[in-house]
């Protein structure tokens, strides 16, 4: 058993628990409008779905067009709060260190706007460690389209079949399958109550990051 040659990760809900930053963002918007704040339990399941899904929870009384108009404000406020409360999930740093010690190259493919993801790397000390970063607006397509994963693999010089993609959302697994890339479903991430990770057909389902400290837990080529 050995670690993969390369691993690509989703960011929010996979490496980083960014839900507290997101909650602070939407609650600041609500408070400014004299509206009641929401709880982390209300927001957490949709964090991986993006800003529009979070605004749909926080501003459920508004129609889709009115919520769409709030997206720029959300992104601006989130940028100001970025990293103030977010933390790595337990076991992620050790997992990355063990991959690096084994000679594995790793990178990030996220649907978060690239400029926001780039701001996070220095906060985590990952500027030199993360071999590639593809955001949701880096290319013409985003997950679940396979293009971001294929481009990331190409940039690190590893065939897609020799990479593993780790993500906490069904679209992550769909993108990996379409790219011909083995996949790991990160069950510690953000999911809706009716999500069924078994139906995603990931190669491996993992409950917590420490399980990925050992090579045997990873999909083997």
Swiss-Prot record:
Disulfide bonds: none
HAMAP family: GPH_hydrolase_bact
Family membership: Belongs to the HAD-like hydrolase superfamily. CbbY/CbbZ/Gph/YieH family.
Protein's organism: Xanthomonas campestris pv. campestris (strain ATCC 33913 / DSM 3586 / NCPPB 528 / LMG 568 / P 25)
Cofactors that this protein relies on: Mg(2+)
Protein name: Phosphoglycolate phosphatase
Catalytic activity entry: 2-phosphoglycolate + H2O = glycolate + phosphate
Gene this protein is translated from: gph
Keyword Magnesium in record: yes
GO molecular function: metal ion binding; phosphoglycolate phosphatase activity
PANTHER family membership: PHOSPHOGLYCOLATE PHOSPHATASE
Pathway involvement of the protein, from the record: Organic acid metabolism; glycolate biosynthesis; glycolate from 2-phosphoglycolate: step 1/1
Residues annotated as catalytic: 10
Gene Ontology BP annotations: carbohydrate metabolic process; DNA repair; glycolate biosynthetic process
GO cellular component, one term: cytosol
């Amino acid at each position: 058993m050995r670690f993969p040659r390369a691993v690509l990760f989703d960011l929010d809900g996979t490496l980083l628990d960014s839900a507290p930053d997101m909650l602070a963002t939407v609650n600041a918007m609500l408070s400014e409008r004299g509206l009641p704040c929401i709880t982390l339990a209300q927001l957490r399941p949709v964090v991986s779905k993006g800003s529009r899904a979070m605004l749909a929870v926080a501003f459920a009384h508004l129609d889709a067009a009115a919520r769409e108009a709030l997206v720029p404000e959300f992104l601006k406020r989130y940028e100001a709060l970025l990293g103030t409360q977010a933390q790595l999930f337990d076991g992620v740093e050790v997992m990355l260190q063990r991959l690096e010690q084994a000679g594995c190259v790793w990178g990030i493919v996220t649907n978060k706007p690239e400029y926001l993801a780039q701001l996070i790397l220095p906060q985590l000390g990952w500027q030199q460690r993360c071999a590639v970063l593809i955001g949701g607006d880096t290319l013409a397509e985003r997950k679940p389209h396979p293009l971001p994963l294929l481009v990331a693999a190409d940039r690190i010089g590893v065939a897609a079949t020799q990479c593993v993609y780790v993500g906490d959302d069904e679209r992550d697994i769909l993108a990996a399958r379409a790219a011909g890339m083995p996949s790991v479903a990160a069950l510690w991430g953000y999911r809706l109550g009716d999500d069924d990770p078994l139906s995603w057909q990931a190669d491996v389902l993992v409950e917590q990051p420490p399980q990925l400290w050992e090579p045997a837990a990873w999909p083997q080529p």
